[in-house]
């Protein structure tokens, strides 16, 4: 269980429209739709890298929303925004075997073809790219072939130890084989030694959740993986964004923000605001202290966000 950091998942009202993400003949995922992601800085300075290194636009017209006074909040903030709304009706006959594999493959190939910022791909990365691109092509088992209803009727799981037990044993059942493969593939893809000799400290995050269907989507089965595989605080963001963007399309995610809380400590807060009808949901994560490699790590983050948005 996580021991440091903080995070929260809040929701008002209820969400009753989510039934399954398994894509069987009666219940299914909506089609993946295209979106856009941009990076802006209040003080007109690009948050990450020159335009030549990324297709993200650096702008200065962002007016940060009012925030609570917490920590050492500076007068500088940056924001990452994206429109991940679904562009079409739900496809009740979504073909995971074909479309799911193709999406995962495209994400991997696009990311590997773009390179890794200022770093140079080595033999280990090349071998990893090849191995993983083959891995996502492997045939799916018959697991979840009949679909999984997220409304399992297992009752309230509350908070504290009950949450940990619930997520560890039940959430895996609410995920399709396709979702497991895509997330696992990205975990493996980013599992490589930190570059430039910077520290690989990862700040754990404690989730406070009201439970229900949304809880399944956020935590899934990767609680223990996050502390074992992710090599730095920024990779924690990779984990949450990858898992969430795969599911938040269903809820028509409107905006994601990365707000600098402390300039000297390079402390950020990541928020994803989602709206399903009139039922707003806020996912908030405080990463803690970044290391001296924050510029390199944030450059990686832009590449991943770009990949997600372009494939929607």
From Swiss-Prot:
Stretches for region Disordered: 1-37, 62-97, 112-159
Main localization (coarse): host cell
Keywords: Host cytoplasm
Domain of life: Viruses
Subcellular location: Host cytoplasm
Composition bias, Polar residues: 74-97, 135-154
Biased composition (Basic and acidic residues): 63-73, 122-134
Positions with biased composition (Low complexity): 1-23
Family from the record: Belongs to the phytoreovirus non-structural protein Pns12A family.
Role according to the record: Constituent of viral factories.
Name of the protein in question: Non-structural protein 12A
Organism: Rice dwarf virus (isolate O) (RDV)
């Amino acid at each position: 269980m996580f021991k440091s950091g903080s995070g929260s998942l809040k929701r008002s009202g209820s969400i009753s429209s989510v039934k399954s993400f398994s894509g069987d003949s009666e219940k299914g995922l909506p089609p993946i739709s295209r979106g856009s992601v941009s990076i802006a800085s209040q003080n007109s300075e690009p948050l990450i890298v020159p335009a030549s290194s990324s297709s993200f636009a650096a702008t200065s017209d962002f007016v940060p929303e009012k925030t609570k006074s917490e920590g050492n909040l500076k007068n500088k903030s940056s924001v990452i925004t994206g429109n991940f709304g679904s562009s079409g009706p739900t496809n009740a006959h979504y073909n995971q075997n074909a479309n799911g594999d193709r999406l995962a493959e495209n994400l991997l190939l696009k990311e590997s073809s773009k390179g890794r910022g200022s770093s140079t791909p080595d033999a280990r990365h090349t071998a990893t790219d090849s191995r993983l691109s083959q891995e996502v092509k492997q045939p799916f088992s018959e697991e979840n072939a009949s679909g999984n209803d997220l409304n399992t009727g297992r009752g309230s799981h509350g908070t504290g130890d009950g949450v940990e037990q619930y997520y560890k044993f039940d959430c895996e059942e609410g995920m399709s084989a396709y979702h497991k493969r895509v997330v696992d593939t990205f975990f493996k893809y980013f599992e490589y030694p930190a570059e430039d000799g910077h520290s690989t400290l990862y700040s754990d995050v404690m989730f406070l959740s009201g439970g229900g269907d949304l809880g399944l989507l956020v935590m899934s089965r990767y609680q223990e993986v996050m502390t074992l595989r992710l090599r730095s605080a920024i990779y924690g963001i990779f984990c949450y964004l990858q898992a969430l963007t795969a599911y938040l399309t269903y809820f028509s995610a409107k905006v994601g923000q990365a707000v600098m809380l402390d300039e000297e400590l390079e402390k950020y807060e990541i928020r994803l605001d989602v709206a399903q009808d009139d039922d707003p949901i806020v996912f908030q994560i405080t990463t803690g202290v970044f290391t001296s490699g924050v510029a390199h790590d944030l450059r990686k983050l832009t590449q991943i966000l770009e990949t997600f948005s372009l494939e929607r």
